[in-house]
Amino acid sequence: MELPVKVGSNSPIYAADRLNLRVKHVDRLSSLLSNFSLHASTFYSGGFCGVAAYPGDVPRGYVHLLRAGRVTLGSSHGEGVVIDEPSLMLMGRPLAHRVSASDEDGAELVCATIEFDGGVDNPLSRALPEYLLLPLSAVPSIAGAIDWLFSEAFGDDCGREAVLDRLFELMVIQLLRHLMASNQLSGGMLAGLANPRLSKAMTLMHDAPAKPWSVADLALAANMSRASFAAQFREVVGMTPADYLVSWRVSLAQKRLREGRPIALIADEVGYESPSALARAFRRKVGASPREWVQRLA
């Protein structure tokens, strides 16, 4: 039997735990990144001339940083946008695109691939916009990381590749902070984490997915009535709190399955009383059983 996500007023959380639900501050990103870490790999830095095409059928994203000059960013459909000021181009998940420049454009680029643990099933990757194009002047909060990154990319210090990879990872995390702080997200998980009240409830689910969280518990953490909390959660995140908890649990299960963990242990870790209960939730979300899903990865 699948462990229910309770929605009634009688919470299964102990009273002592309930007293701790009104948290004053939560780290909205660390619990995500500790479960689904980010990996960057720098593959180009220097003057750029020509056309570079990137496929959309590989499980990775891309970051392109324009330090100087001009490039054209195009899609697989042929449209293109000219970028003629220092800018950041982020494809957080697979997206076919191309970057082009002529000799006269004087383009200087630094490029990296980005991969989240879990690939395209990673909730952070799914939550990001399909692509972001931002002038660097519009994101002053990441200026320090960008300046350091450019200094490494166009220098010749030893260990530069390792430093560049870490700086790209730092930059993406700072960019996530910027997106949540600037209210540029129309909906989804990151928009929920950007909401001061909803983020408290979401972080509880992220930190302790095995607990049978009720709407009453989560509303208490958000300092809202149950009805207001449930309505606002659905409006901002795009699903009910119960459905979000199931989605988060399944995402964690996918990560652990990739690591080769046995499903019996995974079920207990993510809040299900049996492997069959997890398998039912998994099939509803993914369209396949855990065994079938793992076989597809092979």
Locate each region found by the language model.
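A hydrophobic/aromatic-rich effector-binding and dimerization subdomain
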Residues: P4-N20, V26-A40, L95-F154, V172-Q184
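Short hydrophobic/aromatic patch on the recognition helix
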Residues: P86, F229, F233, A277-L278, ...
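Basic, helix-initiating cap at the start of DNA-binding domains
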Residues: M91, G192-N195, E292
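Terminal helix-turn-helix DNA-binding modules in bacterial transcription factors
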Residues: T203, D207, P212-A219, M224, ...
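Solvent-exposed, amphipathic alpha-helical segments
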Residues: G69, S141-E152, K200-A208, L252, ...
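Short, Lys/Arg-enriched, Trp-marked, Pro/Gly-tolerant hinge/linker segments that flank
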Residues: Y131-P140, A153-R166, V172-K211, V215-A222, ...
